[in-house]
């Protein structure tokens, strides 16, 4: 199982967030991690430092030499595919062939102020968009309307460093999305938030079946799972250090974690005490069974379970609110875990 780093920027000072990104990227490059993933986020302080993963990936590319630099994810329906093809070809050139993209359909109506006509057809645009990106990177031309309605034939430049830039499809839990990734010969980027173990197993089976049905070989079978991560010397230290930032994150994203407010079971608003109790219980369950929060030894069973399901890479989200220096310090323990899991 390979280990990469994943960023999403929950509630931290932007300057500190960029420092964490760049210092962690240098560490990942030196220690043999697989990739550094940065997201695309818009119009909200949650994820605010990351409006364009091609920019952050270009920054990471210029200070590293081995680690892959990837988007987690590009929300393709928000953009002109010509620009996406151009930007990521530049990243692939700057990195000497280390670029990769996970492609997402998008879900937040607020984001679609960038492309309001695409919201209702966002799913179909992912399929079409992936096919067009591959065509552009291979040197094919596409037709686009120009001034006065005149149709023009255009190629994008530069070409990527490699013949093919690896692609993933981002899937939150929809079986349809897992199957689409297989049909297109893409990897899968997913998570365990609101997705049960049984559902993940079924979805991965659908993915493998679709991949095989489309005629792709085992080399295309790439399954990456994002996990909130903080590995300390002992489990108790890790659990307590991560508790406040994780519960704050869970409070702001309850539906993502499959949680219901206490007020949904009765009348009137939930009391602070009831909400704290709910979040504390949910944190304990998620931290122990769906996150790499603990010691090296306590995190091993989760990695083994994921490996048994066919997961070959973990994208370790380290910037969920833990102080930057604490997150950086914990990377040494994560590197030990990575070494222990190399042969899984």
Language-model features: where?
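N-terminal beta1-alpha1-beta2 module of alpha/beta enzyme domains
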Residues: 1-63, 67-68, 163-165, 333
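Hydrophobic faces of well-ordered beta-strands that scaffold small-molecule active sites
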Residues: 3-7, 36-38, 69-72, 99-103, ...
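Active-site mouth loops of central-metabolism enzymes
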Residues: 6-18, 74-82, 162-173, 229-232, ...
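Short, acidic/polar
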Residues: 15-27, 87, 171-179, 296-305
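Conserved, mostly hydrophobic/aromatic
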Residues: 28, 32, 40, 60, ...
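Glycine-rich, proline-tolerant flexible connector loops at the mouths of alpha/beta enzymes
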Residues: 35-56, 60, 75, 107, ...
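Internal, glycine-rich beta/alpha segment that forms the wall or movable "lid"
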Residues: 80-186, 198-214, 218
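An alpha-helical appendage that flanks or caps ligand/catalytic pockets
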Residues: 120-157, 198-311, 339, 343-344
């Amino acid at each position: 199982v390979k280990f990469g780093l994943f960023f999403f920027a929950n509630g931290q000072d932007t300057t500190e967030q960029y420092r964490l990104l760049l210092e962690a990227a240098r560490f990942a490059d030196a220690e043999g991690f697989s990739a550094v993933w940065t997201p695309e986020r818009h119009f909200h302080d949650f994820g605010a430092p990351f409006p364009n993963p091609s920019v952050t990936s270009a920054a990471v590319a210029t200070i590293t030499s081995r680690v892959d630099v990837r988007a987690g994810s590009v929300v393709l329906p928000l953009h002109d595919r010509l620009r996406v093809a151009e930007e990521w070809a530049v990243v692939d050139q700057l990195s000497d062939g280390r670029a990769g993209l996970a492609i997402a359909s998008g879900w937040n109506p607020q984001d679609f102020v960038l492309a309001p006509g695409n919201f209702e057809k966002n799913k179909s645009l992912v399929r079409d968009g992936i096919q067009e990106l591959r065509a552009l990177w291979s040197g094919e031309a596409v037709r686009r309307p120009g001034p006065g309605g005149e149709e023009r034939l255009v190629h994008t430049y530069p070409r990527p460093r490699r013949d093919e830039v690896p692609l993933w499809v981002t899937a939150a839990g929809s079986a349809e999305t897992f199957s689409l990734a297989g049909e297109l010969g893409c990897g899968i980027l997913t998570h365990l938030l609101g997705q049960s173990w049984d559902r993940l197993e079924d979805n991965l089976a659908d993915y493998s079946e679709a991949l095989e049905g489309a005629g792709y070989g085992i080399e295309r079978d790439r399954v990456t799972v994002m996990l909130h991560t903080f590995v300390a010397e002992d489990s108790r230290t890790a659990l307590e250090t991560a508790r406040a930032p994780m519960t704050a994150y869970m409070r702001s994203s309850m539906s993502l974690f499959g949680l219901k407010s206490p007020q949904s079971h009765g009348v009137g608003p939930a009391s602070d005490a009831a909400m704290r109790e709910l979040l504390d219980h949910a944190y304990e369950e998620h931290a122990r069974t769906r996150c790499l929060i603990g010691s090296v030894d306590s995190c091993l069973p989760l990695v083994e379970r994921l490996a048994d399901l066919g997961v070959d890479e973990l994208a370790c989200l380290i910037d969920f609110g833990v102080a930057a220096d604490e997150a950086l310090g914990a990377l040494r323990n994560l590197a030990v875990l990575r070494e222990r899991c190399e042969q899984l």
